[in-house]
Amino acid sequence: MRLLDMLGPQGRARKKSRVGTVPEVFIIESLDLADERNARREGEVLAAVLRMCGKQPLYYYIRTRAELELMAQLFYDSNYRYLHISCHGSKSSLSTTLDGIDYEEFATLFAGRLKNRRLFVSACSAGNSKFAKLVRSQNKGVISVAAPAKDIQFDHAVAFWSSFYVKTFSTNSRSMSSDRIAAVLRPLANLFGEPVHLSRKDKAGKWIHGVIGG
C-alpha cells in the first residue's frame, strides 16, 4: 500500500474548481512523542471545529520529513487555499516528530505549491521575516504567511486558531482578505498575549512584514 493511501485524511476533499482554489483548510500536524502520549493534538481539534463551521478540512498527522514532502504535493493537488501546519518550531527551524527541518529546507519542500494560497503556521517563534522571506522566495504567488512571533502554549494555540477560523469564516465563508486576517488576529493576539507575525502584500503590491498585538 502506498504511504499516501495509509495516511488517509480525516475528511473528504472537495472537487477542484476549474479556476482558482477552494476556500478550505488543509491541516498538517507533527508533534513530539510526549505530545502524542498526552494527546496534545491542536490540529486534530482544529479540524473538528472547522467541521462544526460547515467546512471540509483535510487533516493529516505525520512524523517525518519524507512524509512532509509527500504532504506538500498532496496539499497542492487538493486545490485547498489555506495550509495550516501545527508543529514545534524555533527562530530557525520547524520540527516533525523525528526530523528537524530548517526554514530553507521547508521553503524548498513547498516550492511552487503555495501560489494563490495562504500559509498559517502554529509553531513556536516561526513568526519572523526570515521564515516568510524564505517561503516567498520559492513561492512568488503566496498571498500571506502568519505564525506566532514567540513561544506559544498548547492551550493558547488551540483556542487562538479555533477562534481565528470561526470568526473569519463566520464573516465570509468563501474568502479572507489580508486586511480581514489582520483585523481578526489583532484582538486575539492581545487577548491571549500571543503576538503574530503577518507577511502580506500591501495595496501597492509590495510585500510587507509586521507583528500584530501581544
Model-based region annotation:
Residues 33-38, 94-98, 173-174:
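Short, flexible/disordered intra-domain loops and linkers
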Residues 2-80, 122:
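A domain-level signal for caspase-like cysteine endopeptidase catalytic cores
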Residues 72-106:
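A glycine-rich, hydrophobic loop/mini-helix early in the fold
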Residues 32-36, 65-67, 89-93, 125-128, ...:
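Short acidic, S/G/P-rich loop/turn micro-motifs used as interaction or catalytic elements
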Residues 60-62, 145-152, 199-201:
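A generic structural motif
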Residues 100-109, 171-214:
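Caspase-like cysteine protease fold
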Residues 158-170:
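Short, small-residue alpha-helix embedded
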Residues 98-159:
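Catalytic cores of nucleophile-dependent amide-cleaving enzymes
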